[in-house]
Amino acid sequence: MSLPLLECKYVTEEFVREGKNGNYGTKLPSSVPMLRFLYELSWILVRGELPIQSCKAVLEGVEFLDKPSREELASCFADVVTQIAQDLTMSGDQRSRLIKLAKWLVESQTVPQRLFQERCEEEFLWEADMVKIKAQDLKGKEVRLNTRLLYQQTKFNLLREESEGYAKLATLLCRGSASSSHNASAATMGIIKSLIGHFDLDPNRVFDIVLDCFELEQDYDTFLNLIPIFPKSHASQILGFKFQYYQRLEVNSPVPVGLYKLTALLVKEEFINLESIYAHLLPKDEEVFEDYNVSSAKRFEEANKIGKINLAATGKDLMEDEKQGDVTVDLFAALDMESEAVTERLPELENNQTLGLLNGFLSVDDWYHANILFERLAPLNPVAHDQICSGLFRLIEKSITHSYRIARQTRFQSSSSASTVKLTPTANTTANRTYLDLPKEVFQMLVTVGPYLYRNTQLLQKICRVLRAYYLSALDLVRDGSNQEGSAYEVSRGHLKEVRLRVEEALGTCLLPSLQLVPANPAVGHEIWEVMSLLPYEARYRLYGEWEKDDEQNPLLLAARQVAKLDTRRILKRLAKENLKQLGRMVAKLAHANPMTVLRTIVNQIEAYRDMIAPVVDAFKYLTQLEYDILEYVVIERLAQSGRDKLKDDGINLSDWLQSLASFWGHLCKKYPSMELRGLFQYLVNQLKRGQGIELVLLQELVQQMANVQYTENLTEDQLDAMAGSETLRYHATSFGMMRNNKALIKSSNRLRDSLLPNDEPKLAIPLLLLIAQHRSLVVVNADAPYIKMVTEQFDRCHGILLQYVDFLSSAVSPTTAYARLVPSLDELVHTYHLEAEVAFLVFRPVMRLFKCRRNGDVSWPLDSGESMDADSEISESESSMILDVGTSEKAVTWSDVLDTVRTMLPSKAWNSLSPDLYATFWGLTLYDLHVPRNRYESEISKQHTALKTLEEVADNSSSAITKRKKEKERIQESLDRLTGELKKHEEHVASVRRRLSREKDTWLSSCPDTLKINMEFLQRCIFPRCTFSMADSVYCAMFVNMLHSLGTPFFNTVNHIDVLICKTLQPMICCCTEYEVGRLGRFLFETLKIAYHWKSKESVYEHECGNMPGFAVYYRYPNSQRVTFGQFVKVHWKWSGRITRLLIQCLESNEYMEIRNALIMLTKISGVFPVTRKTGINLEKRATKIKNDEREDLKVLATGVGAALSARKPHWVTDEEFSMGFLELKAPPVHTPKHASSQNGLLVGVSQGEPTGERATVNQQPESGGLGKDQMLKTKPLDGRTESIPSKSDQGHLKSKGGNPLDSQPSISKKSMEQKETDETPRISDENPVKPASKYSEAELKASSKRGASVNKSAKQDFGKDDGKSGKAIGRTSTADKDLNYLESRQSGLTKALSSTAANGSIATGSSKVKDDGAEALDAQKQSSRTVHSPRHEIVTSVRSSDRLQKRANAVEDSERISKRRKGDAEHKEHDSEPRSSDRDRSVEARLDLNKTVTDDQSTHRDQDRSKDKGYERQDRDHRERVDRSDKPRGDDVEKARDKSLERHGRERSVEKGLDKGTTRSYDRNKDERNKDDRSKLRHSEASLEKSHPDDHFHSQGLPPPPPLPPNIIPHSMAAKEDLERRAGGARHSQRLSPRHEEREKRRSEENLSVSVDDAKRRRDDDIRDRKRDDRETITVKGEEREREREREREREKSLPLKEDFEASKRRKLKREQQVPSAEPGEYSPMPHHSSLSTSMGPSSYEGRERKSSSMIQHGGYLEEPSIRLLGKEASSKMARRDPDPIAKSKSKNSNFLDIALESMTVNGKTTRGEQSGSGEIGSRE
């Protein structure tokens, strides 16, 4: 019968209809009862009205009334399904749906399968596949199981057992231990067996009773003998039943301790197995571990909260928490937290039977099984329980009792023996020694107990002492084994290694963590350090690192660390000088307990706050040695910590944290001797090996603080002067407030030395030194910096540390012999360790002073031995006789060995200009050897006397004050005596060194084959490396050069040395130096200039110190040749001033940061002596003021300092006239040129005569041997732009018209024109050279040439006016030729003088070429244009003077018109100039490359040039006749005829010009390839000069329009028509002289010109102005034709070469015959062979490729800018009489060749101007 249909109240038809539509999530209107809804839903699903899968959606959408849980829902669903499954009337489809529903409920995890298995019938479970057994079988199995569990009874057989038997058994077992012997045990065993048999007792019951009795009396050994009679398998079961009894819920009593102990004893006796009994214990391990992890996480969370700031706290609460007066430290806070945690875990020990069994094992001393349980229960941390920890402590102490007794006896014996006389150990004492050994179980126990050993500090100290004795015993065993066989020694070493590992393990896992929990017990820390100190620092640091990691794994240690960190921060907030004592002790208490955390926190605070260093260092006086060691580890750890930048964002300065850390470490190590430094030094060594040297700042601070050895770049003048003094003087100057007898300083210095040079450790002093030196060499290459500014900063920092470290080593390692034994040899330093020469000598220099003579062992190098030896054998014998005395038995090192090493340090070609003796002497000496700072000695002695006087005036007469004063007086008197004695000793030392150097000087450079390169090599190899090494070395270099000069060292030219320094090498050195190096270089330049200005101050000073010195010889190879005169020296000073000004301005106007900064630093360093002139100072001050507005702050600061320095020097600035001292005529006076000088000396005279005047900007006239060529070498075009374009732009509004000069009034002067004129200014000043004519010329000749010189000099003045780009003021300068001539004229009555017309022409060209090369110095001289400086020696004849004035006025108009015309032509025909200029430029380049061509090759060119010379002479004759004829005609006719004649010559001579010019150029082009090949090395010096030859295309000398003809009475007679034409066409290159046969006519013309009045000159000037304007317009039409002729001339040049050679050869021979007599004039300098092609390529470095055999007597002209210095006969002969005349005699044979070349170079194509300038360049460059 089926059940009626169910009435659904909740799962209604509407609900079903919505479900069929797929809307299963329809919410019911209200909550429904769960059971009713599930029942209705199940029936709906069974009937199939809804699909089974919709059940989940329906359940999710329904809301039940009672909100049941998931388990309750599953249970109700299972009940519903079970109820429906019992319906027998259900159809098959419905039942299948029901089964399907049940499966779905299980699969969807809605109902667990276990619930269906419990409640459903077997058949339903089988159908639903919920059981694997059939329904019938499952029913049978169920019946059997129920029967066995419910109806089977336990049999106890109580009827057969009698209580009497058990009573007798209990009596037998409880008799006590009186009969506990072996026989008694056997008898007891027999009785028990009898009782079991007689009373039929259950053996298991008997065994149980035996165990119970054993539990009560565990000391009764009889029970142990009774147990074996029972089966072992039963024992574990019986004990298991006992433990299970206490696991019952109804039993509330804990397990008896006796039961744990009984079980542990049975397990220990191996009667039962631990695993068999462990299975009966509860709770299970997994459950316990899970509970412990929850509680441990809670404790970790609480520990991490310690010290965190509560952001929700109000300000008032925070103030209450941080009251100033409430600074307290709770040392037990962490322990209180631990006690609370242990109290919470106390029930765990009662309920956990495993922990009870572990405690039982410890109670029976069974460590083996206890260790097994410890390892198994490690996640539970069982040691935290006091009972287990106490049992472990007892077991540890029992294990070490015997060892502790031995250790105590050994310690007592060692302490007692130390107080008595030390006995020699014997074999018996060694044999009786007891070696301590500890079992490995002790170390296992220590690892297990971990940090909880803090609970028993007494045991902790015992363990420390035992471990120390244990380790020392192993060390003794190794020492004893070292005297035995190899196998025994290896065994002892293996044992030591094992002992060390065990001790380290005990320290890391137990002792150090325990210290962290001991509240402020320094004794414990001391005991631990006694063990730690036996280990090397590497092992200690590893333990400290592991210690920190262990803290994070234990909540107890973490809490202690957090509390210590919080307390430390609170103390540091209040730490100050006032409360230092109180808070310092509190810091120490915290550090005693938690040193790692406290010290790390303090270091972190110091990195952030530098002002905390001093109070913290003072507070650390209470720390123990262990804490000091941990502090060093913390510092190294902070250094090595990754992720922190050690440089600031600018990449230059060190980070604040690193600077603070280094300063802190230096102060700490200085104050506390307990600090160990070996670890830090090893870290620095390792970092240097990796190429990282930033951390060297720590070494710098250590040396500075501990040894008071400081390195500073900004020494005062007094300090720098004292650096040359004795040790006492240096100490007083650089002690920085430290007392000499400061005991603390001495101790700290010795500690630092001992740390670097320990007795038993690797000595790191020398490895650290070598690594620093190598890092210095590589820092520039390997520096990871984007800007060179950062690289230089790193280099300077490393270099400073190197100097400081070497200074410390040399002073700390005493005596010097110990230092010599310590450092490697010079050969090893250079070749093995690859140190640079300057660094190697820095290290080896103290060792060089140990070289002593074999014969006189008391005298060491560099003192004079006092022995007299002949000059030939002196040096060689001294080399072999000096040996190195280091006090060892090693092979003696001789001085010759050092020289052999020195020879390998430089390339072989360097020794052609240097000698090893000079090189070794230079690098071996110091400032102390050369200079006695007497003023500093006297000043310091005066200070000491003042201090004594001050002490005597003290009125305090107390006993303590008197005692203190007495000690102070003794100290001062000691310093006085020492200073006085050292002053005398120093003077004797310098005198002795000077005697030795005086003996050796003659051999230093005499054997050098290439004397031309001496100064360059000396600068490159010696001066520059050392003068940039340190500030004292920069002074030393200047002193050494002065010493070379004062000693009269042969072949060392002092003037050329300064010239090469300033003109060739100074600018590149400024650009490539670092910040500190350029400061040192500036100091060297300051000292050099100071000496030079001292020589310039007075002529008497100059004559006394320089006048007769080889250093001022004109010829390199002949030291006894003529000397540079005082006038020439003043002129070269002008050149040097201009060069320095120009290069400084170029750098200041550069876009490169380094150049600007270095120039400012250089200017700051030399501001004491430079600038000298007011103009130069103003120019430099303007540049500095401009830089003050720069956005870069460091440049602003430097510029401000420079401005202040210049302002301070303003009162000392002088005018140009005062600077020139009358030797530089800044306004052109009459020029007197001797004809003979012109004809013989050729180029040489032309240069000197031409330099003060200037007509056109001849671009190629740049020849400075010493410096001008170098000036132009260095990036000429950028130099022009930077140097002069800016000033001319800024001051272009200041152009003014002055003196009625029509040139100055023209506003159309272009910028390029000014640049061109500035470029051409240098030779006008620096090339001035006094020319002394021969006595054979007449007065008439002098007068004739003076007229021409006057006109030319007037041109120079106006040319200067045009060149001035700033103020537009005309500048006039006068050649010193006429000054020296007139000076000598006053001394030598009757001496005839004359100046050639060639010289006058040369002056026109060279004067204007000086502007640009003088740079800013030209600007300095502009305001002096209207003033003429006259030498006091100038006495000019009245008639000559009046004539000169007339000609100067005429020349001014002439030059003005010519320049104006040229400027117009360039402006109109600019587009047509490129081709002619390029062709001429090519010829100029080819001419410059023709430097080293031999005389034979040159003569082929001379033959071509002779033709043009004769042509020029013929034209000169013709012009002269025409001018004489015109002189008597009216002025108007003269002007017209002169103009017509000039135009006629211009048209007529162009045809001749083409053939001659091309033929001459052909000779130059022929060997161009060979010359290029030879001069390739020189082009690097001359290429810039080539570029500079065309700084501006508008004023290119080859492309200028031809000037109009001059009036007849103004045109210089030396300028032929063709020369004038070619110069205007752009081909003017060389100077041309008059032929000797025209001398008489020239004399007459000169006399006639003297009679011209001033009115005539004015009239002619006005006429000339009008004529030139007209000529200017007419010339424009001719200019185009001239350019076409220039192109044709280039094409026809090669064709005309053969004809020119024949013609030139004949003319050259004729000229040679005419010039033979004056060429050998005594007392004059022989000119050098040169030709026109040597215009400028012989400038900077021409001497490098010049062989001695290819030049006779080479004049040093670079520093004079005028290669030939000619003396008048009387003076020259008098000087030559005092010197060796052989050099002059040797040159006579070659004078004819010199003359040929000079004449040819002057007359090639009639290009007079270029030839004279070429002479200047060539002669100067050959030096």
Curated annotation (Swiss-Prot):
Entry keyword Amino-acid biosynthesis: no
Polar residues composition bias: residue spans: 1394-1409, 1802-1816
Any one of the GO CC terms: THO complex
Example of a GO biological process term: mRNA export from nucleus
Residue ranges of coiled coil: 935-1003
General function of this protein: Acts as a component of the THO subcomplex of the TREX complex which is thought to couple mRNA transcription, processing and nuclear export.
The family this protein is said to belong to: Belongs to the THOC2 family.
Protein name: THO complex subunit 2
Keywords attached to this entry: Coiled coil, mRNA processing, mRNA splicing, mRNA transport, Nucleus, Phosphoprotein, RNA-binding, Transport
Keyword Transit peptide: no
Subunit structure, interactors included: Component of the THO complex, which is composed of THO1, THO2, THO3, THO5, THO6 and THO7.
InterPro entries attached to this UniProt entry: Tho2, THO_THOC2_C, THO_THOC2_N, THOC2_N
Localization in the cell: Nucleus
Basic and acidic residues compositional bias, start-end: 1272-1283, 1312-1330, 1356-1367, 1432-1596, 1616-1625, 1636-1648, 1655-1706, 1768-1785
Secretion signal span: none
Species this protein is from: Arabidopsis thaliana (Mouse-ear cress)
Bias type Pro residues, positions: 1600-1610
